[in-house]
């Protein structure tokens, strides 16, 4: 059993609601965290994925707050992260509690055109937001750590996300750069991680109450900046994976005290059946591990009802956008190359070029380029080569394809391992084809008649693929 820091136990005993048991808390903290996944509805339905995996011995239990989330039990020899279905982006291995903030943000079903995810990496919530937005609009996915942006981009590509612009800033800058610009904001704040002990038994080993105030100060700065960046009428969801009030309720009350009636706490009681078990008097969800057999978590939904005074100067920023709009000739050549593979471009596609590359930009990007610097925007569709235009892997992973060549699971495994696929009935060479499994794309291969020559980018090839 996990050994909890006694100072933490003494502190949290004063925080826990009287109807909950400390013995239950300690017991659940010592249990392994249940494995959970979220189905990527940009590529497949939940019913379709269950029909694929249940015959292999998978058992699914719905996560009550996420329509496409499931706790799963898998066979002992199965490694879900190595499955072909995982590599092709049909599901994301995501802790159940972390599915809650995006669901809270979209619980009213209001359309969101311009959204900020303040702390995006590795991408679980960002990709969930993209699915809820049906790959429409724009998500600004911010990650301060340069080393973590690589994982973020890899997951966006794997899951077929096309509506994201990546930034790399301290999250406290957005109020200044994007004052009252955004329709919605997801702020999963850095925290002391008190709720993560089931995933990391050593997370509380060095727990120290003196550090919490420093963390809470950062959280107050982050939520203040986020609220400044939010449009009047917009919604902010604040969340943490910790348990103490200073990093949770108190941070939300700080915002209320600062901006008064412009801040409205919206109750999450109707987010799912049973939410009342974790509901605070303000309408927040303060989730203790024993309530839903999950991580500890906190979620608040906050509406901005009126404009507020700007508390920072408008920063001067000179944008150097390295792209130019594709001309008619370039667009015609691109469309011909995409059509040959059966890839469809959106009707409102904004296509730009740079150094012979074609990029698809999210439509709502206009007006933002003069406000801040972006590390990466949209998806790379294709590039001009000596013998014509070559469509890129990330384009076929993110855009509708209607001419895919279906292959068997074993062939898909070989493809993801970077190997060519021999064809039993040699015929006429057919050129580049998009390979698919379960009706979802795997990537591009060149049909040479007697084999499919692998075109999967080398950095995406894996040695440990399972079926």
Curated annotation (Swiss-Prot):
Q: Name one GO molecular function term.
A: rRNA (cytosine-C5-)-methyltransferase activity
Q: Which reaction is this enzyme known to catalyze?
A: cytidine(1407) in 16S rRNA + S-adenosyl-L-methionine = 5-methylcytidine(1407) in 16S rRNA + S-adenosyl-L-homocysteine + H(+)
List of residues binding S-adenosyl-L-methionine: 119-125, 143, 170, 188
Q: Where does the protein end up?
A: Cytoplasm
A GO term from the CC aspect: cytoplasm
**Broad class of the protein's primary localization:** cytoplasm
Give the E.C. number(s).
Answer: 2.1.1.178
Q: What class of enzyme is it?
A: transferase
Q: Which family does it belong to?
A: Belongs to the class I-like SAM-binding methyltransferase superfamily. RsmB/NOP family.
**Biological role:** Specifically methylates the cytosine at position 1407 (m5C1407) of 16S rRNA.
Name of the protein in question: Ribosomal RNA small subunit methyltransferase F
